[in-house]
Every structure is written in structure tokens, then in C-alpha cells.
Design a protein with these regions (language model features):
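Conserved AMP-binding loop of ANL adenylate-forming enzymes
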Residues: 1-30
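Active-site glycine/GP-rich loop and adjacent strand/helix microenvironment
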Residues: 19-191
Length: 191
């Protein structure tokens, strides 16, 4: 299935790259601006992807530019990760890409992975990935997938908010606050 990836895979020199073996169109998250939005749109439309993955801020910035140009894409599924997904970002991304977002959370150290439920009513732990504890809304995790150098009781500075009441005991995380950061917009309009 064709995929579009809008993450940090490409540097500032490369705008886009198509990899046949994985059927993936990589778009640079560093070069999203008024000069590249047309090429990004054409690349997406040419491949009719079934899914798009990316940083929420990158997807949102591309969605803003698509909105300015009056353009829509039709991509059934969107996967976000690595940053907080804010409600206003979700709304515009889903509108402009005509998609449904499924958010994911994980650490660079690969000690935990949490995924948004199919009903969009919270998050669940990916089975078999880690053993997790939630103390004062902080995540403490032990990896079950890293046999070379497992991290035991690894604590990140990310924050999750647990659900007070849940009908499905597997979906017990209300939202992920994570950490917040800033984006800087360059003179050329790139993020």
C-alpha cells in the first residue's frame, strides 16, 4: 500500500524522495513552505496513498498551506507521533487530508508504545512491548523488546493523564501531554 511520510527522514537539501521497495513517498518536514506545497500536493495525488505518517506540527503546517491554496487530499488514515497532537491540529489535518488520525506515543529509547484506540476514546498500551507503571501521571517503563540493552524502570519527563472511568479496561489513558516545544518559522517560510 502506498504511504507518505512527513517526518525527519530527509534533510534540508532534499524536498522529497520516493522509495519503490517500501512504496513510500518521503517529504521533508524541514521544507514545508509556499514554494514546495504544490510539489508536495502533486506527489501525494500521483501516488494515491492509503496512509500518511508524520509529526503533528509538520502535517498541520502542510494542511495550513493546502487550506491557503484551497486544496484537499484524500488519504484514508493518518498516523501521528513524536509530538503532542493538539485538538486544532487534529481538526485541520483531518479536514484537509480527508482522513482519520490515529495518534501514537513512544520514547526514543523504545521503552514504551501507546496507541490511540479505534474509537478515538483514549489510548492503550501496545501488548508485549513493555511493562509500564503510572506514578503521579508520569510514565515508568521497562522494555520487553530490547534484548541487547534493556532499560528497566526508565522514567521519561512526559506526562500522561489517566481516565477516571472507562468501559474498556484496555483503554485507560485519556490523553498524552508529553512535553511542549516551539517551532521557528524561517524567512523563506519553512518551519
Amino acid at each position: 500500500q502506498p504511504l507518505v511520510s512527513l517526518r525527519g527522514n530527509l534533510g534540508k537539501k532534499d524536498t522529497m524522495m520516493y522509495v519503490h521497495i517500501s512504496n513510500t513517498l518521503y517529504l521533508s518536514s524541514y521544507n514545508i513552505n509556499e514554494q514546495t506545497v504544490g510539489a508536495y500536493y502533486k506527489g501525494i495525488e500521483k501516488r494515491s496513498p492509503q496512509a500518511i505518517e508524520g509529526y503533528p506540527s509538520s502535517l498541520y503546517n502542510l494542511a495550513l498551506l493546502l487550506k491557503d491554496k484551497g486544496l484537499y487530499c484524500n488519504i484514508p488514515v493518518c498516523f501521528t507521533s513524536s509530538e503532542n497532537l493538539l485538538d486544532f491540529q487534529r481538526q485541520l489535518i483531518e479536514e484537509r487530508f480527508q482522513t482519520k488520525i490515529f495518534d501514537h506515543y513512544g520514547t526514543t529509547e523504545r521503552t514504551i508504545r501507546i496507541s490511540e484506540s479505534i474509537k478515538h476514546d483514549g489510548y492503550f498500551e501496545d501488548p508485549g512491548y513493555s511493562i509500564n507503571e503510572y506514578l503521579k501521571d508520569r510514565v515508568i517503563s521497562t522494555s520487553l523488546i530490547n534484548s541487547a540493552f534493556p532499560l528497566i524502570r526508565y522514567q521519561s519527563s512526559d506526562v500522561v493523564i489517566l481516565k477516571e472511568n472507562t468501559k474498556d479496561e484496555r483503554v485507560f489513558i485519556d490523553r498524552i501531554q508529553g512535553r511542549s516545544g516551539n517551532c521557528i518559522k524561517g524567512k523563506d517560510g519553512s518551519i
